[in-house]
């Protein structure tokens, strides 16, 4: 299997192509995400990682409108216009709901507003995590990411589901009120589906058990969290967090869901087994199919109905094509190419990529099926030798300009130096 050949993080299991950096040790690897989490844990989040100066009233006054949220997403995320619009509205309404609860429902004449958690469906590298992270950054709220495949139900070996809340608390110096404004992104939610849509003895008990445990958090409960590493709570007393106030965004690739949707939408009524799917030539593309997703499709895929009911906002993300990947390399704020150009500029050297080189990078990512997530790894490997030699070469040869061409990507040619 490719997974066995490709180095992966010994802690979270993510492959090298799925992370920005993978550091090798004597007997394993650790990715940049796990390094960051470890740093926060070891340092006890001494300083709040977000601005905690706003009280509730001031915070809710400053919640951006859907148009403002969408505009901010445009700065960092290429494409996915429908998903951006859906997220902008859902997030805006979520914080209106919290504001209404704070006023004891006076703004709605006693009407309680339900919470609309979100399910993002899209292939690896389509921007699910980036969208959620960018939302949290714009709103200035705590943000935590959890991998559903590492979570276990009570009584099993692994990471307890409530550890997700602990991660969120770490991001705001264990301030429960700040955490309750936060956003939690649960990735790989599709990997904990049960094996059959019909409850039976053959189902994936552990997978469904994790779904049940997540359901409790997502629908709302008071979680009592042990604040490990907190200097605010040195005696180890638990912190109560009301999860009904936290916005949960779940994401997954849901490989094979298109076949479930297609079977429902294309099946023609007939006698006995006469119903059949349309031929491949009439098959709709993946994006079109995912726009037709219904809760019943997710049940057939293996999510429990109760969990689907707590994720009412379902939005598909498009698979990124060549043009979108090229745009991701160059256009957003903090674009990958811009970051490397800044690194080279610190050495007094101009870094350029030809159009053909950018196209080749995008094509390589498509072949690897890593989407936008794999772009940084490709560029990093492409420039590794150059960055290694650069400090020496610029002094000995007076290098001021480096150009990366198509051959560098496809054939391993060295960049041109001048």
Swiss-Prot record:
Care to name a GO molecular-function term for this sequence?
Answer: ATP binding
Q: Which UniProt keywords apply?
A: ATP-binding, Chaperone, Metal-binding, Nucleotide-binding, Zinc
List the Pfam families.
Answer: AAA_2, ClpB_D2-small, zf-C4_ClpX
PROSITE patterns in UniProt: CLPX_ZB (PS51902)
For Zn(2+), which residues are the binding ones? 9, 12, 31, 34
Please list the residues that bind ATP: 123-130
One GO cellular-component annotation of the UniProt record comes to: HslUV protease complex
Superkingdom of this protein's organism:
Bacteria
Q: Name one GO biological process term.
A: proteolysis involved in protein catabolic process
What are the boundaries of the signal sequence?
none
UniProt domain ClpX-type ZB: residue ranges = 1-50
User: Which regions span the lipid bilayer?
Assistant: none
Assembly and binders:
Component of the ClpX-ClpP complex. Forms a hexameric ring that, in the presence of ATP, binds to fourteen ClpP subunits assembled into a disk-like structure with a central cavity, resembling the structure of eukaryotic proteasomes.
Family stated for the protein in its record:
Belongs to the ClpX chaperone family.
Stored PANTHER family: ATP-DEPENDENT CLP PROTEASE ATP-BINDING SUBUNIT CLPX-LIKE, MITOCHONDRIAL, ATP-DEPENDENT CLP PROTEASE ATP-BINDING SUBUNIT CLPX-LIKE, MITOCHONDRIAL-RELATED
Q: What does this protein do?
A: ATP-dependent specificity component of the Clp protease. It directs the protease to specific substrates. Can perform chaperone functions in the absence of ClpP.
Protein name (record): ATP-dependent Clp protease ATP-binding subunit ClpX
